[in-house]
């Protein structure tokens, strides 16, 4: 059996003034469509995690990340691939988040996250 493919991913937790966190729904046509996740995406080859976070949130949500703190790094096995995820808490950002990739987004209170259909790979973030 060949070694599992490794995918490096970065995601960010953005909070609004009411203390709610932003989650995004995977759009139709993507793997695990309809499930909810923290916004982010794959790192480009050689890209540093913070730079990738800023790029992904700009591309997906139209926000400019000015500062963020690392929260947790872990791996999750998806069939034949291993996803390494770097999760950040975005502490300073500007712009109004909107789903630029056709994804629905919503603000959710932290205590309501367990009731959302969050990807299994994002479960450790909820517990962090």
Located regions from the model:
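Short, charged, solvent-exposed linker or helix-capping segments at domain edges/interfaces
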Residues: 97-102, 116-120
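Charged phosphate-binding loop/patch that engages nucleotide di/tri-phosphates or the phosphate backbone
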Residues: 121-128
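Conserved N-terminal beta-strand and adjoining loop/helix that marks the start
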Residues: 1-21, 42
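Conserved Nudix-box catalytic region and its N-terminal flanking loop in Nudix hydrolases
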Residues: 20-60
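Active-site-adjacent beta-strand/loop module that shapes the phosphate/pyrophosphate-binding cleft
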Residues: 16, 64-65, 74-98, 106, ...
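Short aromatic/basic micro-patch
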Residues: 37, 107, 120
């Amino acid at each position: 059996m060949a070694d599992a493919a490794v995918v490096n991913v970065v995601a960010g937790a953005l909070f609004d003034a009411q203390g709610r966190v932003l989650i995004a729904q995977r759009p139709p046509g993507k793997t695990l469509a309809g499930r909810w996740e923290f916004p982010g995406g794959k790192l480009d080859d050689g890209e540093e995690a913070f730079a990738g976070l800023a790029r992904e949130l700009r591309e997906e949500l139209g926000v400019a990340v000015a500062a963020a703190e690392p929260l947790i790094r872990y791996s999750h096995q998806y069939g034949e691939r291993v996803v390494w995820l770097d999760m950040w808490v975005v502490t300073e950002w500007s712009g109004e988040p909107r789903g630029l990739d056709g994804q629905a987004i919503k603000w959710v209170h932290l205590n309501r996250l367990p009731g959302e259909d969050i990807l299994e790979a994002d479960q450790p973030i909820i517990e962090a």
